[in-house]
Amino acid sequence: MGRIFLDHIGGTRLFSCANCDAILTNRSELISTRFTGATGRAFLFNKVVNLQYSEVQDRVMLTGRHMVRDVSCKNCNSKLGWIYEFATEDSQRYKEGRVILERALVRESEGFEEHVPSDNS
Protein backbone atom coordinates (compact mmCIF):
# COMPACT_ATOMS: atom_id res chain seq x y z
CA MET A 1 0.00 0.00 0.00
CA GLY A 2 1.23 3.49 -0.83
CA ARG A 3 1.43 6.56 1.34
CA ILE A 4 -1.72 8.23 2.57
CA PHE A 5 -1.70 11.98 1.96
CA LEU A 6 -3.88 13.98 4.33
CA ASP A 7 -5.16 17.54 3.93
CA HIS A 8 -5.15 20.11 6.74
CA ILE A 9 -8.04 22.57 6.68
CA GLY A 10 -6.61 24.95 9.35
CA GLY A 11 -8.62 26.98 11.83
CA THR A 12 -8.68 27.85 15.53
CA ARG A 13 -11.02 24.97 16.58
CA LEU A 14 -10.44 21.65 14.82
CA PHE A 15 -12.45 18.44 14.57
CA SER A 16 -10.43 15.25 14.10
CA CYS A 17 -10.95 11.49 14.02
CA ALA A 18 -11.29 10.22 17.61
CA ASN A 19 -9.39 7.06 16.66
CA CYS A 20 -6.27 8.42 14.90
CA ASP A 21 -6.46 12.24 15.24
CA ALA A 22 -6.50 12.92 11.47
CA ILE A 23 -7.80 16.47 10.94
CA LEU A 24 -11.27 16.51 9.36
CA THR A 25 -12.67 20.06 9.52
CA ASN A 26 -12.87 23.21 11.63
CA ARG A 27 -15.54 25.12 13.52
CA SER A 28 -16.06 27.68 10.72
CA GLU A 29 -17.43 24.84 8.52
CA LEU A 30 -20.03 23.87 11.18
CA ILE A 31 -23.62 24.44 10.01
CA SER A 32 -25.67 22.81 12.78
CA THR A 33 -25.30 20.81 15.99
CA ARG A 34 -28.95 19.71 15.98
CA PHE A 35 -28.64 16.30 14.34
CA THR A 36 -28.75 12.75 15.67
CA GLY A 37 -26.71 9.80 14.41
CA ALA A 38 -26.42 6.13 15.36
CA THR A 39 -24.23 7.01 18.37
CA GLY A 40 -26.25 10.04 19.51
CA ARG A 41 -25.50 13.70 18.86
CA ALA A 42 -24.20 14.62 15.40
CA PHE A 43 -23.01 17.78 13.63
CA LEU A 44 -23.63 18.98 10.05
CA PHE A 45 -20.58 20.46 8.27
CA ASN A 46 -20.15 22.25 4.96
CA LYS A 47 -16.62 21.00 4.13
CA VAL A 48 -14.78 17.98 5.55
CA VAL A 49 -11.43 16.59 4.32
CA ASN A 50 -9.62 13.25 4.70
CA LEU A 51 -12.68 11.07 4.13
CA GLN A 52 -13.44 7.87 2.23
CA TYR A 53 -16.94 7.34 0.83
CA SER A 54 -19.10 4.21 0.57
CA GLU A 55 -21.48 3.43 -2.27
CA VAL A 56 -24.70 5.47 -2.39
CA GLN A 57 -27.49 4.10 -0.19
CA ASP A 58 -31.19 4.95 -0.08
CA ARG A 59 -32.20 5.69 3.54
CA VAL A 60 -35.44 6.74 5.15
CA MET A 61 -34.60 9.08 8.04
CA LEU A 62 -36.66 11.16 10.46
CA THR A 63 -36.64 14.04 7.97
CA GLY A 64 -37.56 11.94 4.92
CA ARG A 65 -35.91 9.85 2.25
CA HIS A 66 -32.29 10.63 1.36
CA MET A 67 -29.53 9.22 -0.83
CA VAL A 68 -26.41 9.09 1.36
CA ARG A 69 -22.89 7.66 1.50
CA ASP A 70 -21.27 6.56 4.74
CA VAL A 71 -18.00 8.39 5.39
CA SER A 72 -14.95 7.00 7.14
CA CYS A 73 -11.51 8.31 8.05
CA LYS A 74 -9.06 8.20 5.14
CA ASN A 75 -6.22 7.42 7.57
CA CYS A 76 -7.66 4.62 9.79
CA ASN A 77 -10.98 3.63 8.11
CA SER A 78 -13.06 4.37 11.25
CA LYS A 79 -16.69 5.16 10.42
CA LEU A 80 -17.47 8.82 11.18
CA GLY A 81 -20.91 9.60 9.73
CA TRP A 82 -22.40 10.18 6.27
CA ILE A 83 -22.73 12.67 3.43
CA TYR A 84 -26.05 13.67 1.91
CA GLU A 85 -26.04 13.17 -1.87
CA PHE A 86 -29.74 13.84 -2.55
CA ALA A 87 -32.85 14.74 -0.55
CA THR A 88 -36.32 13.99 -1.91
CA GLU A 89 -38.01 16.75 0.13
CA ASP A 90 -37.46 20.34 -1.05
CA SER A 91 -37.15 21.51 2.57
CA GLN A 92 -34.18 19.15 3.07
CA ARG A 93 -32.18 20.10 -0.05
CA TYR A 94 -29.85 22.34 2.01
CA LYS A 95 -28.21 19.11 3.27
CA GLU A 96 -27.08 17.98 -0.19
CA GLY A 97 -23.28 17.77 -0.40
CA ARG A 98 -22.96 18.36 3.35
CA VAL A 99 -21.41 15.95 5.86
CA ILE A 100 -22.72 14.62 9.17
CA LEU A 101 -20.01 13.74 11.72
CA GLU A 102 -21.14 11.84 14.80
CA ARG A 103 -19.96 13.61 17.96
CA ALA A 104 -18.88 10.37 19.68
CA LEU A 105 -16.58 9.55 16.75
CA VAL A 106 -14.72 12.87 16.48
CA ARG A 107 -12.63 14.98 18.84
CA GLU A 108 -12.62 18.79 19.05
CA SER A 109 -9.35 20.54 19.89
CA GLU A 110 -7.57 23.88 19.72
CA GLY A 111 -6.18 24.78 16.31
CA PHE A 112 -4.02 27.78 15.56
CA GLU A 113 -4.52 31.38 14.52
CA GLU A 114 -3.36 31.92 10.96
CA HIS A 115 -2.06 35.33 10.02
CA VAL A 116 -2.63 35.99 6.35
CA PRO A 117 -0.84 39.15 5.25
CA SER A 118 -2.98 41.62 3.35
CA ASP A 119 -1.85 43.48 0.24
CA ASN A 120 -1.57 46.65 2.35
CA SER A 121 0.98 45.31 4.87
From Swiss-Prot:
Modified-residue entries (Phosphoserine), positions: S118
- Give the disulfide map: none
Q: Which GO terms describe its molecular function?
A: metal ion binding
Q: Which Pfam families has this protein been placed in?
A: Yippee-Mis18
Q: Which GO terms describe its cellular component?
A: centrosome; cytoplasm; midbody; mitotic spindle pole; nucleus
Where do the Yippee domain residues begin and end? Answer: 13-110
Protein's cellular compartments? Nucleus; Cytoplasm, Cytoskeleton, Microtubule organizing center, Centrosome; Cytoplasm, Cytoskeleton, Spindle pole; Midbody
Q: Keywords in UniProt for this one?
A: Cytoplasm, Cytoskeleton, Metal-binding, Nucleus, Phosphoprotein, Zinc
The similarity annotation says: Belongs to the yippee family.
What quaternary structure, including any partners, is listed in this protein's UniProt entry? Identified in the CTLH complex that contains GID4, RANBP9 and/or RANBP10, MKLN1, MAEA, RMND5A (or alternatively its paralog RMND5B), GID8, ARMC8, WDR26 and YPEL5. Within this complex, MAEA, RMND5A (or alternatively its paralog RMND5B), GID8, WDR26, and RANBP9 and/or RANBP10 form the catalytic core, while GID4, MKLN1, ARMC8 and YPEL5 have ancillary roles. Interacts with RANBP9 and RANBP10.
**Function comment:** Component of the CTLH E3 ubiquitin-protein ligase complex that selectively accepts ubiquitin from UBE2H and mediates ubiquitination and subsequent proteasomal degradation of the transcription factor HBP1. Required for normal cell proliferation.
Name the UniProt record assigns to this protein = Protein yippee-like 5
Q: Supply the gene name.
A: YPEL5
